[in-house]
């Protein structure tokens, strides 16, 4: 069984624009179009059995939209989607409970895109609360091709 554990998708209405921005920032050409349908096509071509989508909440206002989109994709056609939260969101425990209620297995954090250092106390509190609820926590580490060094 092959599982691609680090994928991203975007809502169809913003996927093309978002992919172009990421391509320009990274100086590379994307091999997929950023949509769920594009991911499924890529999975089939590559022989991938499951893909895990890791959305990134880059600002607190994206919380509802990203998690509702993640929940809609989760569990369909060999797709597992995590949720997302920003360390500057208010009511972190309630928001994490909502992610769990949506049936999402965990959250993805991205210190660079969220513009908060990983050793910031906000992350520690957020991670502790997530673990207490039984949510998995994925933290992006290393260099991101879409960000300047």
Locate predicted features.
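Active-site gating/metal-coordination segments in enzymes
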Residues: 49-50, 60-147
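An N-terminally biased module of ancient metal coordination in phosphate/nucleic-acid-related enzymes
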Residues: 1-56, 61
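Glutamate identity and glutamate-enriched acidic tracts
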Residues: 13-16, 23, 115, 121, ...
């Amino acid at each position: 069984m092959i599982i691609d554990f680090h994928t991203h998708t975007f809502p169809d209405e913003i996927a093309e624009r978002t992919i172009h921005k990421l391509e320009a920032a990274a100086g590379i050409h994307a091999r997929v179009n950023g949509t769920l349908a594009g991911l499924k096509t890529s999975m089939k071509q590559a022989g991938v059995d499951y893909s895990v989508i890791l959305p990134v909440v880059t600002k607190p206002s994206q919380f509802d939209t990203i998690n509702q989109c993640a929940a809609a994709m989760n569990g369909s056609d060999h797709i597992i989607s995590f949720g997302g939260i920003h360390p500057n969101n208010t009511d972190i425990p309630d928001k994490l409970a909502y992610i769990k209620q949506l049936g999402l297995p965990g959250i993805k954090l991205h210190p660079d895109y969220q513009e908060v250092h990983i050793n910031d106390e906000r992350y520690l509190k957020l991670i502790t609360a997530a673990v207490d609820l039984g949510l998995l926590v994925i933290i992006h580490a290393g260099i991101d091709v879409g960000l300047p060094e």
